[in-house]
């Protein structure tokens, strides 16, 4: 009997999903493209840096080594651009970080999706002889 009572009370206090985000009308913003050797992440923010939407190659169903391809970066950027345009975005300033293969593909697909790219800036961090890099691969 006690188990049934516990089950019923748990169902009554079941938490609701978080409320759906309201659409913000942001005509200008920033697109941050982080392209690593393993993945590409596209984050679209307002001018203050608050995240409006994001997408990545892994989020779009690519697994393993396919995440690091230019096509995966293109799909991720298209997805992020579509979400941003639903929030009223028209112009973006692009900031590219990292050495990955999807850098140019992501920028091209942002433009092809209908966003006007006003500037492209490379913000890849360059160490002043910081951490030791990974050893060279011997194949």
UniProtKB/Swiss-Prot annotation:
Q: Name one Pfam family in it.
A: Ribosomal_S11
Question: Compositional bias (Basic residues) at which positions?
Answer: 14-23
Q: Where is the composition biased (Low complexity)?
A: 1-13
GO biological process annotation, one example? translation
MF GO annotations: rRNA binding; structural constituent of ribosome
Q: Which GO terms describe its cellular component?
A: ribonucleoprotein complex; ribosome
Fill in the subunit field for this protein.
Part of the 30S ribosomal subunit. Interacts with proteins S7 and S18. Binds to IF-3.
- HAMAP family this protein is in? Ribosomal_uS11
Report the protein's function.
Located on the platform of the 30S subunit, it bridges several disparate RNA helices of the 16S rRNA. Forms part of the Shine-Dalgarno cleft in the 70S ribosome.
Tell me the protein's name: Small ribosomal subunit protein uS11
Gene name of the encoded protein: rpsK
């Amino acid at each position: 009997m006690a188990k049934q009572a516990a089950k019923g009370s748990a169902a009554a206090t079941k938490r609701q999903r978080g409320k759906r985000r309201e659409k913000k009308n942001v005509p200008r913003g920033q697109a941050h493209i982080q392209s690593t050797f393993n993945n590409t992440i596209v984050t679209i923010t307002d001018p203050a840096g608050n995240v409006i939407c994001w997408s990545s190659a892994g989020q779009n169903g690519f697994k393993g080594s396919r995440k690091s391809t230019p096509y995966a970066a293109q799909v991720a950027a298209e997805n992020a651009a579509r979400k941003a345009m639903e929030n009223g975005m028209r112009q973006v300033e692009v900031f590219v970080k990292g050495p990955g293969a999807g850098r140019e593909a992501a920028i091209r697909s942002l433009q092809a999706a209908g966003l006007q790219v006003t500037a492209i800036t490379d913000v890849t961090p360059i160490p002043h002889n910081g951490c030791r890099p990974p050893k060279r691969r011997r194949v």
